[in-house]
């Protein structure tokens, strides 16, 4: 079961269509395997349809907006059962290849990456797949902007906890971490970066000028 989910504001932006294509892809991947968040988005979609139908010219006040978020956070949600035998997820459709067959490029430590930003030509953010070998470590780093990540395979841990398959996490300039892949399987993630990461290790920080 997923332990790390998009917050209610993020789900509301997704429901309203106010999200870039790469970020929407991350949400769709999470929703495909998280019945709890899928039910919350269904609730938001229904609420939005009612508001559009009944009050198309009325703007949502700040207090009403807060009430909607509180309702989504606090109302009990009956998760719908996950369906087995689903078709290819949207990332597989986009790439046309299994994750294990992609042309990974080895980087520092036990990490490999594949930049797939070219699949989103209208976006300015960098979209990358990242892979840590089982038990491997990524270099310690922080972020110059926001990084949105979903775990596609395996799991990793850092100072914030353990992130397993289909977990969702958002990091920014305040976060410094050194992800470690759990034993048993390579950890593969999809990340969207608004700016390059910043290495913080004693020696690796010398490479910062060369990081895109």
Regions found by a protein language model. Give the residues of each.
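Positively biased amphipathic helices and basic secretion/translocation or surface-docking motifs
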Residues: 1-9, 22, 32-35, 43-100
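Ligand-binding loop in jelly-roll beta-barrel domains
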Residues: 175-199
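Short beta-strand His + acidic residue motifs that chelate non-heme Fe in jelly-roll/DSBH
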Residues: 41, 138-141, 159, 177-183
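A short glycine-rich, His/Asp/Glu-containing loop-to-beta-strand
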Residues: 102-134, 139
């Amino acid at each position: 079961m997923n332990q790390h989910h998009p917050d209610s504001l993020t789900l509301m932006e997704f429901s309203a269509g106010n999200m870039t294509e790469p970020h929407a892809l991350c949400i769709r991947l999470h929703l495909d395997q998280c019945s709890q968040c899928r039910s919350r988005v269904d609730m938001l979609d229904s609420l939005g349809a009612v508001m559009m139908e009944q009050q198309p010219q009325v703007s949502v006040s700040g207090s009403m907006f807060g009430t909607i978020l509180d309702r989504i956070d606090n109302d009990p949600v009956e998760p719908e059962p996950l369906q087995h035998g689903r078709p290819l997820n949207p990332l597989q459709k986009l790439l046309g290849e299994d994750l294990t067959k992609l042309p990974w490029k080895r980087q520092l430590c036990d990490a490999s990456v594949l930049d797939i930003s070219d699949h989103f030509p209208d976006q300015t953010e960098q979209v990358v797949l990242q892979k840590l070998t089982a038990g491997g470590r990524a270099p310690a780093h922080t972020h110059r902007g926001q990084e949105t990540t979903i775990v596609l395979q395996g799991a990793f841990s850092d100072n914030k906890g353990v992130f397993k398959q289909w977990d969702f996490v958002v990091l920014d300039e305040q976060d410094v971490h050194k992800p470690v892949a759990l034993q048993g399987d390579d950890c593969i993630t999809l990340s969207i970066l608004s700016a390059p990461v910043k290495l913080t290790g004693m020696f690796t920080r010398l490479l910062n000028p060369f990081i895109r």
